[in-house]
């Protein structure tokens, strides 16, 4: 159990609504002292799952506030413990006073995410669902919110569990044959195991693609604008976000540092990164800017390579090399307005635009939307939210399944079984069944205090 959770017997309390004045404010409590605290606040009777109008009293029986109290007895609550919600006026002063009174009556201030952590530890949620709560709260658009809702409803969890069961059955089959190691595998057994490994690999590959898609929905597509100096990268960024955020001049090398802006196209989030132009020479400051550009490319989901439509030369060997590791590359020929003749037929991965006039920008936005959504999830109904750690765990799982396939080809049954065990362990990190305590601590510490 994590260090954060060694006091599971404590009763915790926190303000669950956003800071600032509002019409309603909520304090949430969870733990074994709920009835004692309710009595201390002046509530003599509470019926489960009923809204009780009451006055919340201080130690001198003075009224702190009035509002509604709702009691959810264990185990039928969000955390699996006794839960009490106090709904009063959204005055920060009154909420702090009411929270202090709850703490004086025996509760302690909850850590960030501790309510969700208790729900996880008490088996009310798996780790995917707990993270989906935070993803739903932080969603930047409706589609991402709906994807997080599906993860909270268990769409992602059920697919992981189905794969976990396949791994268990397959490992049992392989280990059963080890008991008869003196006999070679018969044709039927060999075919069954090989088919099961192939089926597992196909389904795992599809789940990995869908998880990558879910991560893009939640995080947005990290899109880095790169290219030679003075081709209009900053102008293009300004045109796409509809604001003069980046400095634009005719002097090559004006952009020395990276600039990040979140923007939504067709209801989907993109993180656009303007970078220093890349060329073979430059002063010390410009070279530092170019180094940062190459670093940004290492984390890019997509590179927009911006070139001058009048002279579309990349002009940098370092950029050409760096692009080989970027998952997606889209070529932009900017300054279309300066061409004296219409552009000749271009490759489908090249989009002619003019940051100055806006020509081609809608085509670019549509292409960006297509790149974010991809074709990995057949319907919107199948989308779910995912995080980087989920994708990485699935990648490790897939690598172990691939190794199991290779070991089985040589009839190394013990090694095949071991790779399947490691695959199951990696997959279990996703829903928390195999997650180390320090990972759980990091995940829940990033939640809101009242969640």
From Swiss-Prot:
Its cofactor is K(+). The keyword Oxidoreductase does not apply. It is found in: Cytoplasm. One of its GO terms (cellular component) is cytosol. GO terms for molecular function: GTP binding; GTPase activity; metal ion binding. Homodimer. Heterotetramer of two MnmE and two MnmG subunits. This is tRNA modification GTPase MnmE. It comes from Xylella fastidiosa (strain 9a5c).
């Amino acid at each position: 159990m994590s260090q954060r959770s060694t006091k599971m017997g404590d009763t915790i309390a926190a303000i669950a609504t956003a800071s600032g004045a509002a019409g309603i404010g909520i304090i949430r409590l969870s733990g074994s002292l709920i009835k004692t605290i309710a009595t201390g606040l002046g509530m003599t009777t509470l019926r489960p799952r009923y809204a009780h109008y009451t006055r919340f009293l201080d130690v001198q029986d003075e009224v702190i506030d009035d509002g509604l109290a709702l009691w959810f007895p264990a185990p039928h609550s969000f955390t699996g413990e006794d839960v009490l919600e106090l709904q009063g006026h959204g005055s920060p002063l009154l909420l702090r006073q009411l929270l202090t009174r709850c703490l004086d009556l025996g509760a302690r201030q909850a850590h960030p995410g501790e309510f969700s952590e208790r729900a996880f530890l008490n088996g009310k949620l798996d780790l995917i669902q707990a993270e989906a709560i935070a993803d739903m709260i932080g969603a930047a658009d409706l589609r991402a919110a709906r994807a997080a809702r599906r993860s909270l409803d268990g769409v992602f969890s059920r697919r992981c569990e189905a794969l976990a069961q396949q791994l268990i059955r397959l490992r049992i089959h392989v280990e059963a044959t080890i008991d008869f190691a003196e006999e070679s595998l018969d044709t039927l057994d060999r075919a069954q195991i090989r088919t099961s490994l192939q089926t597992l690999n196909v389904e795992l590959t599809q789940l990995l693609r869908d998880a990558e898609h879910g991560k893009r929905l939640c995080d947005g597509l990290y899109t880095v604008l790169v290219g030679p100096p003075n081709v209009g990268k900053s102008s293009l960024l300004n045109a796409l976000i509809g604001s003069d955020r980046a400095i634009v001049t005719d002097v090559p090398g004006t952009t020395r540092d990276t600039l990040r802006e979140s923007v939504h196209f067709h209801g989907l989030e993109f993180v656009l990164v303007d970078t220093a132009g890349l060329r073979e020479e430059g002063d010390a400051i410009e070279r530092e800017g170019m180094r940062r550009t190459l670093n940004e490319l290492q984390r890019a989901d997509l590179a927009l390579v911006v070139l001058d439509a009048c002279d579309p030369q990349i002009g940098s060997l370092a950029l050409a090399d760096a692009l080989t590791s970027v998952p997606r590359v889209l070529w932009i020929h900017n300054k279309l307005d300066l061409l004296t003749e219409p552009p000749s037929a271009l490759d489908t991965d090249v989009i002619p635009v003019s940051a100055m006039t806006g020509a081609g920008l809608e085509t670019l936005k549509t292409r960006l939307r297509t790149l974010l959504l991809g074709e990995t999830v057949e319907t919107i109904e199948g989308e779910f939210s995912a995080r980087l750690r989920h994708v990485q765990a699935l990648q490790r799982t897939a690598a172990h399944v691939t190794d199991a396939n290779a070991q089985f080809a040589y009839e190394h049954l013990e090694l095949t079984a071991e790779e399947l065990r490691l695959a199951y362990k990696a997959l279990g990190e996703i829903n928390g069944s195999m997650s180390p305590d320090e990972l759980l601590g990091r995940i829940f510490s990033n939640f809101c205090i009242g969640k």
